[in-house]
Amino acid sequence: MKVDGQAASDEVALPGTVVGAPRRWLLLEGMTLLVGSIVAFSTTHQSWWLALSLLLAPDIFAAGYMLGTRFGAHLYNMAHATPLPALLVGVGWWQGHQLVLALGTIWLGHIGMDRMLTFGLKYPDNFQHTHLSGAEKQQEPHHYA
C-alpha cells in the first residue's frame, strides 16, 4: 500500500531502490533479456557448454570489493550493465564473428538472469544495496531506551 507516493510502514525500501510496478517491469525486462539472449546465442552455432561455462563469468568482477566498496561497486556495475556486452554483440554481428557475438549474448544473458532474480546494480555503501534489492518487507529497527 502506498501513501502519498511513499511506501507504507510495512514496506521499508532502501534509498534508490525501485519498488512497486516499476520494479516488476524491471524483473520482466530481465527475463526478456535472458530469453532473447538464449535465442540469439542459438543462432551463433557455438557449443552450449560455452554458454554454461561462461554464464557466471561476469561475477568475477565482484572481486573488486576487495579493494573497497566504492571501487567494487563501480567495477561490478561496469560488468553488469548492458553497454559493453551490447557492443560485443554489435561488433560480432557487424564483423560476422560468431564467437564474439556468442560472448556478448552470454554476457547479456547473465545480466538478464541477474535482473530477473533481483540482483541489481550496486550502490557503493553496501554490496547488498542494489537498485532492485531492499524493497522486500522488512521489520522496522528496534530502538531500545
Enumerate the predicted regions with their spans.
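N-terminal membrane-targeting hydrophobic helices
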Residues: 1-145
